[in-house]
A protein has these predicted regions:
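Short linear motifs in intrinsically disordered
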Residues: 4, 63, 109, 172-173
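Conserved beta-strand-loop-alpha-helix hinge in the C-terminal portion
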Residues: 179-202
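Short, small-residue-biased leader/transition segments that mark boundaries at the very start
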Residues: 1-7
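C-terminal/domain-terminus segments
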Residues: 161-184
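Charged, low-complexity C-terminal accessory regions
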Residues: 197-216
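Flexible, glycine/small-residue-enriched loop-and-beta-strand segment within the central core
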Residues: 17-22, 26-159, 187, 194-195
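Extracellular beta-sheet-rich ligand-binding/adhesion modules
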Residues: 8-16
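Conserved acidic donor-binding loop of glycosyltransferase catalytic domains
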Residues: 120-121, 168, 174-175, 191-193
Length: 216
């Protein structure tokens, strides 16, 4: 049966999924917690051990991709469209990385999250100049093919990274990377920034009490 077939491919893990598809050779290891509406794993895809995956998003692992160990993939409580986390063919997420899937995350083929401790964010907040006002900004993250991301990087909301890029350790990526090559962090510098002006070009998706949620 389909249930027994899934059981043969799963170690000692908790998997709470409404729609699940596991193709030949894929595997879920031990001590994972997975709770999401949809899980699709293509041929020889793997979820290793001790991963925590929970949220209102669909998870798709393409051929021979891997989420290895101790990674955390979650979403915030509110999303306003169908959200998907896609891991491309032969792509690999190694150890103890964090992904916020409030909006879509797409990771290209043969892309590597190396080392430990990288964070990928698909939402952020703008605070008003005074008072209690704060506004959530959602933005999908797209990472191309053959991208190598080193330990403890931060990839911010709405960023797009082109193919064949290397990102050095401890880098903060707050804007699109369009040309292939090596990127490393720079010295701290001041940038003029007005949240109100920035939000004026965005669409407010919803207001919850005093919190307005915008789409980047």
């Amino acid at each position: 049966s389909a249930a027994s077939d899934v059981y043969k491919r799963q170690g000692f893990s908790i998997v709470l999924v409404k729609d699940i598809s596991l193709l030949d050779g894929c595997k879920i290891g031990h001590f994972n917690f997975i709770k999401c509406p949809c899980l699709k794993m293509s041929e020889s895809a793997m979820i290793g051990n001790l991963n925590f995956i929970r949220g209102n998003f669909s998870l798709e692992l393409r051929e021979e991709s891997m989420i290895y160990m101790q990674n955390k993939i979650t979403s915030s409580g509110y999303s306003f469209h169908d959200v998907t986390f896609v891991l491309g063919k032969y792509a690999s997420i190694q150890v103890a990385h964090l992904f916020d899937v409030t909006d879509n995350i797409k990771i290209g083929d043969n892309t590597l999250f190396a080392g430990v401790g990288t964070q990928v964010w698909t939402h952020s907040f703008y605070l008003e100049d005074s008072g209690k006002g704060r506004h959530r900004i959602d933005g999908s993250v797209s990472i191309g093919n053959n991208v190598n991301i080193s330990s403890r990087c931060i990839i911010c909301c709405g960023v797009k990274i082109a193919d064949s890029i290397i990102i050095g350790a401890n880098s903060c990526i707050s804007k699109d990377l369009k040309s292939k090559g090596l990127y490393v962090n720079q010295e701290l510098r001041f940038i003029e920034f007005d949240p109100a002006e920035k939000m004026s070009s965005m669409i407010c998706q919803k207001s919850i009490g005093k919190l307005n949620i915008y789409k980047k």
